[in-house]
Every structure is written in C-alpha cells, then in structure tokens.
C-alpha cells in the first residue's frame, strides 16, 4: 500500500530535480552567487560613475531598457544579460590598456558568468521590456535592487 506512495514521491522528486528545481543544498550556493552578483553590480556602478574616465561619457547618453514587470525571479536575469551585451557594445570594450575599462570589462565578464550559473538550464523565458528607457546608472541601480530583493527573500 505504501509502495505506490513511495514510488510516486520518488518520481516527483526526480522530476523536480531534472527540471532544475532548487534543492536545499543548492540554496546556499545560490545565495552566494546572488551576493557575488550584487557586489559585482555595485562595483560596476562605481566604475561607471567615475567622472575621470572620458570614454565612459558616451555611455551616459545611451538608453537601456528594463523589464516591464517587477522582476522577482532569477529567470529575469536573462534580461540583464541582454542589456549588458548592449552596454558592452556601447563601451566598445576591446582589449584596452586603460585600467578602468579593463576593470569594467572584468566586472561585466564576471556578472555574465554568475548570471549564466544562476539561470541554469532555463532558456525558455522571454524578456518583456518597458517602453521607458533609463540611463546606465539607473539601469545598474535597478538590477542592484533586484539582487537585494532576491537575496533578502532567501535569508
């Protein structure tokens, strides 16, 4: 009698694990990754706001899109990746001897790596962007707020 219930429970567990559902052991890693992402976004914001770097002035005139809905799930990080690619193109971050640009490129590469790890196998999500655009600093601030929100729900 209990055999059917046990088999059903095992099948459900396997289905959840196969579909990338978070398990309790991965929650700690996810928290660390979200915290790292938050710190990298804050570092990138500091570098972007640095008035000494003239090449960044171009970026301050560029408009970025933010998701239409209030982002509350890790799958929304796909939207960050899409816009981060545009930021990289705006900065034209080819190998540079400029220390600030290299640090920005390193931060962006690290952010992309962390986002890909956090997304896992989720590829079906499509970003819906708001019609209004924001400047680079506000764009980064919105994603910092997103990470803080995600992190606070995990603790």
Swiss-Prot record:
Positions bearing carbohydrate? 23
Asked whether the keyword NADP is assigned, the reply is: no
Keywords in alphabetical order, please.
Adaptive immunity, Cytokine, Disulfide bond, Glycoprotein, Growth factor, Immunity, Secreted, Signal
**Signal sequence residues:** 1-20
Q: Is this entry keyworded Nuclease? A: no
User: What is a single molecular function from GO for this protein?
Assistant: cytokine activity
Kindly state a single biological-process term from the GO annotations of this entry: adaptive immune response
- InterPro entries reported for this sequence: 4_helix_cytokine-like_core, IL-2, IL-2_CS
Among the entry's GO cellular component annotations, what is one?
A: extracellular space
Please give the positions of the paired cysteines in each disulfide bond.
79-127
Q: Cite the Gene3D superfamilies for this sequence.
A: 1.20.1250.10
Localization (cell): Secreted
* Role played: Cytokine produced by activated CD4-positive helper T-cells and to a lesser extend activated CD8-positive T-cells and natural killer (NK) cells that plays pivotal roles in the immune response and tolerance. Binds to a receptor complex composed of either the high-affinity trimeric IL-2R (IL2RA/CD25, IL2RB/CD122 and IL2RG/CD132) or the low-affinity dimeric IL-2R (IL2RB and IL2RG). Interaction with the receptor leads to oligomerization and conformation changes in the IL-2R subunits resulting in downstream signaling starting with phosphorylation of JAK1 and JAK3.
**Similarity-based family:** Belongs to the IL-2 family.
Q: Which PANTHER family match?
A: INTERLEUKIN-2
Query: What is the name listed in the Swiss-Prot or TrEMBL entry for this protein?
Result: Interleukin-2
* Protein's organism: Moschus berezovskii (Chinese forest musk deer)
């Amino acid at each position: 009698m209990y055999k059917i219930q046990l088999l059903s429970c095992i099948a459900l567990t396997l289905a959840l694990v196969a579909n990338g559902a978070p398990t309790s052991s991965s929650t700690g890693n996810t928290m660390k990754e979200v915290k790292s992402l938050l710190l990298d976004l804050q570092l990138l914001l500091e570098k972007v706001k640095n008035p000494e770097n003239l090449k960044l002035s171009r970026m301050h005139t560029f408009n970025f899109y933010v998701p239409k809905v209030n982002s509350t799930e890790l799958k929304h990080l796909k939207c960050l990746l899409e816009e981060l690619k545009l930021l990289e193109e705006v900065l034209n971050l080819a190998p540079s001897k400029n220390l600030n640009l290299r640090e920005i490129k390193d931060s962006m590469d690290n952010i992309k790596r962390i986002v890909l790890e956090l997304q896992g196998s989720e590829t079906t999500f499509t970003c819906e962007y708001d019609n209004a655009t924001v400047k680079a600093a506000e764009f980064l601030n919105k994603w910092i707020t997103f990470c803080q929100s995600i992190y606070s729900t995990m603790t």
